[in-house]
């Protein structure tokens, strides 16, 4: 078995404890589009998937309003994103891995600029070797981004572990 050299961290839901906040954001904006709100975490888990476009489709978002819903969601999410907590042991765990000599990277489906802003809110940008987000707000797959990064670093996939909270994170791993 190959020794682990690199940790790829998911951001939303893994280091950032934004599950309840994300549900609140959806429930705040969906009524304006005559779309159903969520009753809670269980319903969210039943519906959520990647890419997020499919999650939106499951919730009744048509192609005609997808862009409007995505932009409204992003604006509402950013409005109070400085109130979202990290998971209780997130910083300590990152530090423990750093002390063990592991490379660490945030690999997120979030838009790159917003991702950097969020990490900065918690003083975390400098704790990672790289922060890899997407070039758009549509939260598509991060698999290719991760693969390209590992290739550019020369780190074999077998020496990498992905830590996340979604089925997509398991697919990326």
Features from the language model and the residues they span:
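Substrate-recognition "cap/lid" segment bordering the active-site pocket of phosphatases
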Residues: 83, 113-161, 167-171
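Well-formed, non-transmembrane alpha-helical positions, independent of function
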Residues: 55, 96, 118, 171-172
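N-terminal helical cap/lid subdomain that shapes the substrate entry/recognition surface
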Residues: 3-92
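Short helix-capping segments at alpha-helix termini
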Residues: 31-37, 62, 100, 123-127, ...
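Short, acidic loop-to-helix structural element flanking the phosphoryl-transfer center
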Residues: 78-106, 112-116, 143
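Short beta->alpha linker loops
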Residues: 47, 88-89, 110, 137, ...
């Amino acid at each position: 078995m190959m020794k682990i050299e690199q940790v790829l961290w998911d951001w939303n839901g893994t280091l950032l404890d934004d599950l309840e906040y994300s549900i609140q954001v959806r429930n705040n904006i969906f009524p304006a589009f005559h779309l159903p709100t969520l009753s809670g975490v269980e319903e969210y888990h039943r519906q959520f998937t990647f890419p997020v476009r499919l999650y939106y489709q499951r919730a009744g978002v048509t192609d005609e309003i997808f862009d409007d819903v995505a932009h409204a969601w992003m604006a509402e999410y950013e409005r109070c994103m400085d109130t979202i907590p990290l998971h209780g042991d997130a910083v300590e765990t990152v530090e423990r891995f750093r002390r063990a000599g592991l490379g660490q990277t945030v690999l997120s489906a979030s838009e790159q600029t917003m991702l950097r802003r969020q990490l900065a809110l918690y003083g975390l940008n400098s704790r990672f070797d790289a922060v890899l987000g997407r070039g758009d707000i549509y939260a598509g797959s991060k698999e290719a981004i991760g693969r390209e990064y590992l290739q550019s670093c020369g780190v074999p996939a077998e020496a990498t572990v992905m830590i996340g909270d979604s089925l997509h994170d398991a697919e990326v791993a």
